Amino acid sequence: IEDSPRFSWRGQHLDCARHYYDVSSILRLLDLMSLLKLNRFHWHLIDDESFRLELSSVPELAVRTGMRGEGCTIPGVFGGSKGPTGGTYSAEDVSKILDHASSLGISVMPEIEIPAHSLALLKVFPEMRDPEDQSVEVSVQGYSENTINPAMPATWNFLKSVLPEISSLFPFGLIHLGCDELPPKVWERSPAIKKLMAEKNLKTTQDLLEWTMQRASNILVEEGARPAAWEEAASGDNGGIGNDALLFSWSGQEPGLKAAREGYEVVMCPAQHVYFDMAQTENPLDRGVSWAAIVSMEAALNWDPVPLKEPELEQNIIGIQGALWSETICNDKHMDTMLVPRILALSEVSWSSTLRKRSLPEFMGTVNHFSRVLNQLGWESYHLD
């Protein structure tokens, strides 16, 4: 049998910021990925709700934000037990996960979220905001003041400290910098920002965002690492983040297509097809959310990362990736039915060409058989009607 994958990047993301997953659960996910020929693990370690990664350069971050609950730095948002919940990942934990991933042929990309999604970071280092900023920004998740300020020297002192350390921990050499969901009205009333924009001849907030990402990515390049970011890092008209960054298109396919046309390499992860935190049916008892779509098995299977009318874009669209955000996850086992069996469709789309990909009725035979195999391996499957 001769077979080869359509895409080089066949990934799965896991949000360990909203819910802390035990190291054993991450190793278990890597085993599942290997079985399905998925070869990239996007490890989302940091967000508004926690900074899970223990770093020697800023040890207080994980100590103060790793646990959430009454009396903690971050209140008890999300979680599934009485009292403070959470945890952190040590250098030893990282090494164990990387070693196991490597043995399975899987590369690991960590993510640090900037400039937004930084509430936990700012709770510990408030000096990364302009004290004279009168902006009243609120994130789509409802958090106020969750965005670091690129005009503050403390912001760059922090990034110049932590990014080299993170790069040294993860030898794959690809570091995701975030860059999604900048809140409306952010920085608008910051005197320091107004001064910076005048000095750098930046006209819009998007210009400032892209300048910020360029400067942050320069730090990684100096360390010999390659930057990655969400689609917003190149959604303007001024070239974007640059630095050979790998972009992830999440809100739909069009932002990724735009970036691919502009020469960026892109991983497609549109929420309407591969966000596995989305509910699988309209049943109100279904776990999950639905702000992007109801992601059924059909939705996960029936899409093409590359438009038929633009086949030349396949040279820049290097793969696809599933995402499991963890706002609705209360214990590690909840991961099972959110992933299985939809992750099988992810594997199918990432491996097979459009001409070879099976129709839904054909594919369901494989799903039914393979779900039983996974059940024997300890993975609980969502029961499809």
Segments (PLM) and residue ranges:
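Feature activates predominantly on carbohydrate-active enzymes
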Residues: I1-N157, V162-L174, R215, I219, ...
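Generic recognition of stable, solvent-exposed alpha-helical segments in well-folded globular domains
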Residues: S25-R28, Y89-K96, A154-S161, D207-R215, ...
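Hydrophobic alpha-helix position signal
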Residues: M33, A101, M197, L220, ...
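Acidic-residue sensor for enzyme active/binding pockets
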Residues: E111-E113, E181, E232, E348
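Active-site neighborhood of glycoside hydrolase catalytic domains
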Residues: L121-P131, S135-A245, W250-Y264
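Flexible, acidic glycine-rich loops studded with aromatic residues
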Residues: P227-A234, G239-A245, S249-D385
